[in-house]
Every structure is written in structure tokens, then in C-alpha cells.
């Protein structure tokens, strides 16, 4: 099997401006307003051309001090981001989206935190990686409205994982909707709470 490796140099990389999330309005991290990555991650693309196996851990500390880890051995494929969005926003492992996508995939697979917190992490990690405010907010909207969500956290009873109930967003994705939302974000510069309200609005 031909192995293709990529190295992400993420040694204690700090990132720029942040609005505290709704569940922690007092959170302020002026030194690392978008959080920071630490360590390095090495990954191997598998022969199927879709899956990537992490050969070392990726750590991200979000602006509220919560540490998110993608462990070595994790297999990711970008599935936490609906595939239909790839044509609008680019592939999940393209350019500046890559680190945030890896963490988001692992968080969605583990389901040990609320999906809203995972999506907020994804937004902050994108900004930490240098994704523009408009692109990051548009992707956040798309995930919040069309993402694969769950009602209950996955717990562990002894060595047996308790299965969670998945609640898919059965809403069709249209390029027109995404482009209209992107234009609104560019012109109005909404907060994440305003974006969430728009995403929760009934389909016309």
C-alpha cells in the first residue's frame, strides 16, 4: 500500500478575535482569542482515497479553555460535514479547513459533548486556522441547519458504550440558500446566535 503522509506544523499556534459562546458569557481569552493548536499531527491517506488515519494526536484548546483531542489512530473522512456542502464550500480537508474538520469528525464520532458545542468548536477552530469570518460563519450556518445531530450524549457503562439517538436534519441543501446566507453574513455581520436563529427558522 502506497502511503502518503502529510505533516501539519501546529506547535502551539495561537489565533486571533473571539465572541464568547452563549453557555459561557464570561469566557475571555485575550492571549488566544480563537484558541490554539498544540503538537504536530501526521496522517496517512488510505487506499480508498476517502479515509485518513491519524498517526499522532492533534490537540486544540478552544477560547473557553476546553481541550479537544483527535487521538492517534482516529480514522476521518469528512463525513461530519454533509457531502453536498463540499461543492459549495470546498472539501473538508482542503486548505485551512483541514484541522478543524479533523477535530469535528472525531467529536461527531465520539458524541460525548452536545452537538452545538462541537459546532461552536468547529467555528472557532476554523477561525484559529485563518478561515475568513464570512466563510467560517457560512459553514457554521450550513452545519447548524443541515448537519447530522443527536439528542443524547454517548455514555459508557463499564466497557459498553450506550448508543445515542441520532437526529438527522432532513432539510434539503440548495446552493441558492447557501449563497443567500453568505451574502447576508457579508452585509450584516451577524452574531453566531443570530445565525443559529436563522438556521432554526422553518423552511419557507
Regions found by a protein language model. Give the residues of each.
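Hydrophobic h-region of N-terminal signal peptides that target proteins for export
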Residues: 9-16
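Sec-dependent signal peptide recognition
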Residues: 2-7
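Extended terminal accessory/targeting regions
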Residues: 16-204
